[in-house]
C-alpha cells in the first residue's frame, strides 16, 4: 500500500476530524487549504478555522486564498505536486484546472447518499424531508455540483428524535474511516467508480432564517421535522404578543405531534405542564422546550410560570 501525498481542503470541525484521520494514517498531508480567517465572537477578532488550527499544530503549510480562480493561486497549488486533493466542507469552488492538477484527481466527502441531496445542506435536508436513512458518499470530483462518480458509501439511520447536530456527529464518526479506506485502496481497484443517476437527484438548498419561522399552515409533522433540522442553526421560532401588545419571539428546540383538532391553524389549544399545544393545518404541535429572547432554554412549564399571558387559550398566532 503506497502512501499518498495529499492536499487537504476543508474548513469546519467536520473537516478537521477527517484531517486528523489522515494525519493518523500512513499518508502525508503536504499542504492544507482552508477559508480565510473570519471575525468571530463579541470582539469580532479574526478566528482561524478548525482545519487551520489543526494544520498549524502539526506544522503543515496552510494556504487561504479567497478564490482558486487566479492563475498564481493555481500555479502555486500545481507546484505542490500532490497525488490527490481531499475536499471536505471547504467552501470554495474548484475550477477544472485545480481538479485536474493532482495525479489521482480530487476526492470529496459528502454528507448524504448521492445522488440524493446534492448541494449545501444535505444533513439538514434529510431530516427536514423525513428521510429514514442517510450516510456519506466519497466521490471523485468533477466540474458539477456533487455530480462526480461515487467510490464508496456508508449508511446510517435517522432516528425520530434526530437533530442536525446529532446527525452531524454520527456522520463525523462514520466518514473519516471510510475516507481512509478509499485513500488506502485508491490505486488497488477495490472501489469501482459508479456513475450517479441524475434522474434520482435532488438539491439540498441552504437554510435561511426566514424558513425557520414556524408556519402554522404547514402540517405538524413537517413543523416538528423543521425544529430538529434547523438545530443548531438557524433554530425554528415563532412570535406571540405579551399583555402590552409587544411582539415576543421564541425559539423552539423540542416539540411533538399530537392528533388533529378542528381549529384554525395557529390557535393555542392548551398551555400547561404538558406543553403549549398549537393547531396546524394537519395535526397539533405541542411545544416542549423553548427559549425567549435573551433568556435561557426552558421547558414549556417553566416558561408558563412567568409568562402564561403570552399563551391565552383560543389566541390565534400569526
From Swiss-Prot:
What is catalyzed by this enzyme?
Answer: L-methionyl-tRNA(fMet) + (6R)-10-formyltetrahydrofolate = N-formyl-L-methionyl-tRNA(fMet) + (6S)-5,6,7,8-tetrahydrofolate + H(+)
Domain of life, per UniProt, equals Bacteria
Q: What is its EC number?
A: 2.1.2.9
**First-tier enzyme category under EC:** transferase
A GO molecular function assigned to this protein is: methionyl-tRNA formyltransferase activity
Among the entry's GO cellular component annotations, what is one?
A: cytosol
**SUPFAM superfamilies in the record:** FMT C-terminal domain-like, Formyltransferase
Does the keyword Transferase belong to this entry?
A: yes
Q: Which UniProt keywords apply?
A: Protein biosynthesis, Transferase
Family designation: Belongs to the Fmt family.
Q: PANTHER family under this entry?
A: METHIONYL-TRNA FORMYLTRANSFERASE, METHIONYL-TRNA FORMYLTRANSFERASE, MITOCHONDRIAL
Sum up the protein's function in the record's words: Attaches a formyl group to the free amino group of methionyl-tRNA(fMet). The formyl group appears to play a dual role in the initiator identity of N-formylmethionyl-tRNA by promoting its recognition by IF2 and preventing the misappropriation of this tRNA by the elongation apparatus.
Give the NCBIfam families listed for this entry.
Answer: fmt
**Alphabetical list of HAMAP family matching this protein:** Formyl_trans (MF_00182)
Protein name, per record = Methionyl-tRNA formyltransferase
* Organism (species): Haemophilus influenzae (strain PittEE)
Question: Lineage of this protein's species?
Answer: Bacteria, Pseudomonadati, Pseudomonadota, Gammaproteobacteria, Pasteurellales
The encoding gene is fmt
Amino acid at each position: 500500500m503506497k502512501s499518498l501525498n495529499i492536499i487537504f481542503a476543508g474548513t469546519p470541525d467536520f473537516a478537521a476530524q477527517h484531517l486528523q484521520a489522515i494525519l493518523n494514517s500512513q499518508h502525508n498531508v503536504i499542504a492544507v487549504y482552508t477559508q480565510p480567517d473570519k471575525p468571530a465572537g463579541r470582539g469580532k477578532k479574526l478566528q482561524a478555522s478548525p482545519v487551520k488550527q489543526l494544520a498549524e499544530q502539526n506544522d503543515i503549510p496552510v494556504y487561504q486564498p479567497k478564490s482558486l480562480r487566479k492563475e498564481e493561486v493555481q500555479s502555486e497549488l500545481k507546484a505542490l505536486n500532490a497525488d490527490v486533493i481531499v475536499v471536505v466542507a471547504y467552501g470554495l469552488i474548484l475550477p477544472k484546472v485545480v481538479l485536474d492538477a493532482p495525479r489521482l484527481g480530487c476526492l470529496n466527502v459528502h454528507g448524504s447518499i448521492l445522488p440524493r441531496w446534492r448541494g449545501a445542506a444535505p444533513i439538514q435536508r434529510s431530516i427536514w424531508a423525513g428521510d429514514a436513512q442517510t450516510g456519506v458518499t466519497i466521490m471523485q470530483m468533477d466540474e458539477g455540483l456533487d455530480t462526480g462518480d461515487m467510490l464508496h458509501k456508508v449508511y446510517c439511520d435517522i432516528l425520530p428524535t434526530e437533530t442536525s447536530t446529532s446527525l452531524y456527529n454520527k456522520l463525523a464518526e462514520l466518514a473519516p474511516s471510510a475516507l481512509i479506506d478509499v485513500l488506502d485502496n485508491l490505486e488497488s481497484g477495490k472501489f469501482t467508480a459508479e456513475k450517479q443517476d441524475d434522474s434520482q437527484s435532488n438539491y439540498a438548498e441552504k437554510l435561511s432564517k426566514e424558513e425557520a419561522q414556524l408556519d402554522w399552515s404547514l402540517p405538524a409533522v413537517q413543523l416538528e421535522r423543521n425544529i430538529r433540522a434547523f438545530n443548531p442553526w438557524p433554530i425554528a421560532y415563532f412570535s406571540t404578543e405579551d399583555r402590552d401588545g409587544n411582539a415576543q419571539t421564541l425559539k423552539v428546540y423540542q416539540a411533538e405531534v399530537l392528533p388533529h383538532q378542528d381549529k384554525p391553524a395557529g390557535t393555542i389549544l392548551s398551555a400547561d405542564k404538558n406543553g403549549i399545544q398549537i393547531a396546524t393545518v394537519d395535526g397539533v404541535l405541542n411545544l416542549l422546550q423553548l427559549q425567549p429572547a435573551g433568556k435561557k432554554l426552558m421547558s414549556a412549564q417553566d416558561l408558563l410560570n412567568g409568562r402564561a399571558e403570552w399563551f391565552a387559550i383560543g389566541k390565534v398566532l400569526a
